């Protein structure tokens, strides 16, 4: 009996799907059934036989931990081999080839640093291996810094018996209780101050250190200078390169010859040119000037290069000619703000504005009467003033 879903919402009504089966051959049906059986997930509830489990199980290869001796340089001797025996793996581990060694961050390139196979060491290869997985300071200590042989290596301090457990972060112990058996705490390398920092110094040979007076000699016979000396020397070299011109009188330095010549001409008090001023005389009237520029401006008063095109009158300055041309055109652009009068020149407007103030610019010393122009004051002093000038 079909259910009635008339009152049920559309999104909750079931969908009726009718599968149309097509006729197929017997061979095709068998192939489809076999593929369907392979696609089905494995039933884990069924127990398999013990022989099937042993066939699927593969025993993983045991991992062995190795502690590397980083305290020695790549040049091995009898003393280094005796010290490395303290940190070497067990005897049975020596049967493994170097390519079978599994360690954190190390590959088959660690042939020179495994204590199991003492082979010839390539310093560049070993330095790359140390920088890749272990300790870059120990690798670069002897390979690239041959002058630091007198200083203690950071790896030697870490590989010492007191701090042998400092490698726990790199290689864990073989058993969980090995740390508790010794009863010693790992050494904190952040508070050590006996490890020198070669990056803060510039190393030099003995021949170079003898020529440098600011170098400091160490107990090992090599000398070093602080890094600030190189920067200060470069600054001094740049300063000497930029300021090449020097005044012989006051020892001041200038970057250009023009600056030095102007200093000698105007500013230097020890120069003879400033002690006895050179004078330039006018050929027309004989006036003397201290600078050539002032003499050229004076010569224009004799030549009068600015001429009026209307009346032919000449002037020494172009702005004087411009004010003269306004007298021909009748233009008066400067107007008085207090009265309706206007003027062709700005100087005439300023003189006119003195008539509107109570105290003028020019005053008589006898009667204290003030005037807007100097010409009016002179006219008053000669005729109108009743008190004679003593």
From Swiss-Prot:
Example GO molecular function: DNA binding
GO biological process per UniProt: asymmetric neuroblast division; central nervous system development; compound eye development; ectoderm and mesoderm interaction; gastrulation involving germ band extension; Malpighian tubule morphogenesis; mesoderm development; negative regulation of DNA-templated transcription
Stated role: Essential for the correct specification of ventral-dorsal patterns.
Keywords from the UniProt entry: Developmental protein, DNA-binding, Metal-binding, Nucleus, Repeat, Zinc, Zinc-finger
Location within or outside the cell: Nucleus
Domain of life: Eukaryota
Region of interest: SNAG domain: 1-20
Organism (species): Drosophila melanogaster (Fruit fly)
Database matches in Pfam families: zf-C2H2 (PF00096)
Family statement: Belongs to the snail C2H2-type zinc-finger protein family.
InterPro entries from the UniProt entry: Snail/Krueppel_Znf (IPR050527), Znf_C2H2_sf (IPR036236), Znf_C2H2_type (IPR013087)
Main location as per UniProt: nucleus
The keyword Zinc-finger appears for this protein: yes
Cell cycle found in the keyword field: no
Name recorded for this polypeptide: Protein snail
GO cellular component: nucleus
Zinc finger (C2H2-type): 245-267, 280-302, 306-328, 334-356, 362-385
Lineage: Eukaryota, Metazoa, Ecdysozoa, Arthropoda, Hexapoda
Listed Polar residues bias regions: 32-43, 162-172
Chain spans, region Disordered: 29-65, 162-191
Gene responsible for this protein: sna
């Amino acid at each position: 009996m079909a259910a009635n879903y008339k009152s049920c919402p559309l999104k909750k009504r079931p969908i009726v799907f009718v599968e149309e089966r097509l006729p197929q051959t017997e061979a095709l049906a068998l192939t489809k059934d076999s593929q369907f059986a392979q696609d089905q997930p494995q039933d884990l509830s069924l127990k398999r036989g013990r022989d099937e489990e042993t066939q699927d199980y593969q025993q993983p290869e045991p991992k062995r931990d190795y502690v590397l001796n980083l305290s020695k340089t790549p040049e091995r001797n009898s003393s280094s081999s005796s010290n490395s025996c303290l940190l070497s793996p067990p005897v049975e581990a020596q049967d493994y080839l170097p390519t079978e060694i599994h360690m954190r961050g190390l590959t088959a390139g660690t042939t020179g640093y495994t204590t199991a196979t003492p082979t010839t060491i390539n310093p560049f290869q070993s330095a790359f291996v140390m920088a890749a997985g272990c300790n870059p300071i120990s690798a670069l200590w002897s390979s690239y810094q041959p002058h630091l042989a007198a200083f203690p290596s950071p790896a030697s301090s870490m590989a010492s018996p007191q701090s042998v457990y400092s490698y726990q972060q790199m290689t864990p112990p073989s058993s969980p209780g090995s740390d508790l058996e010794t009863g010693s705490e790992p050494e904190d390398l952040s508070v050590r101050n006996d490890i020198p920092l070669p990056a803060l110094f510039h190393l030099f040979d003995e021949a170079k250190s003898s020529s440098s007076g600011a170098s400091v000699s160490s107990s090992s016979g090599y000398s070093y200078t602080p890094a600030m000396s190189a920067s200060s020397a470069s600054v001094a070299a740049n300063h000497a390169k930029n300021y090449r011109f020097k005044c012989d009188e006051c020892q001041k330095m200038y970057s250009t010859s023009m600056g030095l010549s102007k200093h000698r001409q105007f500013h230097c008090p020890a120069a003879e040119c400033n002690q006895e001023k050179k004078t330039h005389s006018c050929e027309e009237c004989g006036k003397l000037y201290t600078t050539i520029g002032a003499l050229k401006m004076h010569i224009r008063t004799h030549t009068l290069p600015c001429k009026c095109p209307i009346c032919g009158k000449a002037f020494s300055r172009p702005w004087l000619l411009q004010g003269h041309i306004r007298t021909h055109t009748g233009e008066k652009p400067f107007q008085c703000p207090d009265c309706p009068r206007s003027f062709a020149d700005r100087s005439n407007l300023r003189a006119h504005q003195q008539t509107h103030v109570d105290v003028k610019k020019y005053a008589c010393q006898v009667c204290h009467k003030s005037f807007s122009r100097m010409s009016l004051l002179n006219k008053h002093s000669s005729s109108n003033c009743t008190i004679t000038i003593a």
